[in-house]
Amino acid sequence: MAKIVKVIGREIIDSRGNPTVEAEVHLXGGFVGLAAAPSGASTGSREALELRDGDKSRFLGKGVLKAVAAVNNEIAQAIVGKDATNQAEIDQIMIDLDGTENKSNFGANAILAVSLANAKAAAASKGLPLYAYIAELNGTAGVYSMPLPMMNIINGGEHADNNVDIQEFMIQPVGAKTLREALRIGAEVFHNLAKVLKAKGMSTAVGDEGGFAPNLASNADALACIKEAVEKAGYVLGKDVTLAMDCASSEFYNKENGMYEMKGEGKSFTSQEFTHYLEELCKEYPIVSIEDGQDESDWEGFAYQTKVLGDRVQLVGDDLFVTNTKILKEGIEKGIANSILIKFNQIGSLTETLAAIKMAKDAGYTAVISHRSGETEDATIADLAVGTAAGQIKTGSMSRSDRIAKYNQLIRIEEALERAGTPAAFPGLKAVKGQA
């Protein structure tokens, strides 16, 4: 038995200078797991609650001492003495103890940090790397895949202080044969994009996720700049590199009049018009994945978008599904989107995260493992992507150590599997829904 002997919570700082929760889980035998909760900027209304103190005298009200206290007191008392290898039981104890639908008592940030730290401690006690232990928990022991990166190289929306409405413009190095080659391609395009922007007299300051955040005349301009950078790097757009976007449409949807108001370029669309606007962009550029292409509450709009684009474009639900199996189940039944974005802290525990990935895969949806805009050096999502063979990961651009930490962990995992004589396949474009 991998007995839990001590649980410690603390307040640390994330990549935006805001506090977050870090947890340590100690086991008999000296095994320790350490994990931190991430934090989002554009958040779905149905996400599990991130508990903040609201004390304006500390961190402008964003302190997490209440969540930390929950870790050090109620949660610690409930799980000390339990077997860390019973991940589902540990998570359920915390969920039941919290007693709310959205984890608002302790905070999803408290529960998640402990959940992940527990998994890391349990993996250590079994002498397994985290990705291998996650595969065991997932019921797919020994089945691994390296993920195709979706690299956010131009940031807009809530992730940047510029006039670009669409939140993320991403590249996917689909022509690569390995994860390491994919990262090299991504880095080369990123550096060439800096040259393209500088030549146009534009800013090369970066946003929350490490992508550039220039002011541009339109969203199409962002895609044109990326196209130029891809070609400048010596690659063929549509063959070596494909494009993806996160619209984060809820951020510019006007609930009062039902219009999508893109103030950056002075355009306003109905739900169906916005789908056709995106359709035109897909005709002009090899965009193979669109995330949150409608407001989270506009299910009628999502159904229409899925009908129009779903046979050839991966339509990812982030704010739409918030990593929640109840909401995802309803979406699957109604034919809404064809992919889910997976964010640990939207649901608040490893067990529930694995359940969402399984439900998606069983329904023929893809699952894209994702960071948040507020991150730490914690690289657990890299192990999650490999251990569930999810096939795709979204963890930012080729700058900012909080993003690169995940890529470097993927490099280590890929190398370790190769050395063991069990290399994990890199799926390339096949990982993307509608592109196999």
UniProtKB/Swiss-Prot annotation:
PROSITE patterns: ENOLASE. The lineage of its organism: Bacteria, Pseudomonadati, Pseudomonadota, Gammaproteobacteria, Pasteurellales. Pathway: Carbohydrate degradation; glycolysis; pyruvate from D-glyceraldehyde 3-phosphate: step 4/5. Its EC number is 4.2.1.11. (2R)-2-phosphoglycerate binds at Q167, K343, R372, S373, K394. This is Enolase. One of its GO terms (biological process) is glycolytic process. Mg(2+) binds at D246, E291, D318. InterPro entries: Enolase, Enolase-like_C_sf, Enolase-like_N, Enolase_C, Enolase_CS, Enolase_N. It is found in: Cytoplasm; Secreted; Cell surface. One of its GO terms (molecular function) is phosphopyruvate hydratase activity. The keyword Magnesium applies. Binds a second Mg(2+) ion via substrate during catalysis. Component of the RNA degradosome, a multiprotein complex involved in RNA processing and mRNA degradation. Pfam families: Enolase_C (PF00113), Enolase_N (PF03952).
